[in-house]
Regions:
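Hydrophobic, regular-secondary-structure patches
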Residues: 7, 11-102, 110, 118-122
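Short beta-strands and strand-coil junctions in structured, solvent-facing domains, enriched
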Residues: 44, 99-102, 134-135, 152-154, ...
Length: 224
């Protein structure tokens, strides 16, 4: 019995160490994609977890003009906005722009590859991470509705007036991007601005001046 107990104990320790090593490798793969992440004031860890790993809540928003400014900066090789707010079956819908998929790896080759389809072209087209496609069973041309919030919660508001259509499915990357749904930042703006106008009309109040200024949750960057 002692020998069996030792063997089981050693096996458990080895399994934990292997899982830890694999987790560290996965975290390093994600962190190595970007050099800088810009976001609202708050915890730097929370900012990275929410915008890179799709795990935590965002720290706040930035004006979209900040993204355009970074995009023009000669020190920036690549940049892309990240807009959060909705999910589908627990997978976050990430609003961004087409250059998101132009991200190069550290050898200068494209990081993202399409297993099927293409990048989004219309406002409510989306690209699925590999895990999203395999878990949900969504295929090219399928449509679905996003749900308000970053996680799946019973009774959460479903945006039934704004159907998404799948235009592409990414090849596995071994990163958190496999667990995300990528759509246009413009679609995120349209959904939530429409809701704000509706809620204001119901409450009999006007939107605050400047409320509808374009914003982004975070900005991902790779430097030259």
């Amino acid at each position: 019995l002692t020998l069996i107990g030792i063997a089981v104990g050693v096996a458990l320790v080895c399994a934990v160490l292997a899982l830890r090593h694999e987790s560290e490798r996965a975290l390093s793969r994600d962190a190595g994609l970007y050099d800088l992440v810009a976001g609202g004031k708050g915890s730097p860890l929370q900012l990275v977890l929410s915008s890179v790993y799709h795990l935590d809540s965002p720290t706040g928003n930035l004006p979209y003009s900040d993204f355009k400014r970074f995009q023009r900066d000669p020190r920036v090789l690549w940049s892309a906005p990240v807009g959060l707010g909705d999910n589908y079956s627990g997978y976050r819908i990430v609003g961004t722009e087409t250059q998101f998929f132009d991200l190069p790896n550290r050898e200068g080759h494209p990081f993202f590859e399409f297993a099927q389809g293409r990048v989004f072209e219309d406002r409510f087209e989306v690209v699925l991470g590999s895990q999203v496609a395999s878990s949900t069973g969504l295929e090219l041309g399928d449509t679905f509705f996003g749900t308000h919030g970053l996680v799946e919660v019973p009774g959460a508001e479903v945006h039934r007036d704004f159907p998404y259509r799948v235009s592409g499915i990414l090849a596995p990357t071994g990163t958190a991007q496999d667990r995300a749904i990528f759509g246009t930042l413009a679609s995120v703006w349209e959904i939530h601005e429409t809701e704000d106008r509706l809620h204001s009309a119901i409450q009999g109040s006007a939107l605050l001046e400047g409320h509808q200024k374009r914003e982004t949750t975070a900005i991902l960057m790779r430097l030259k």
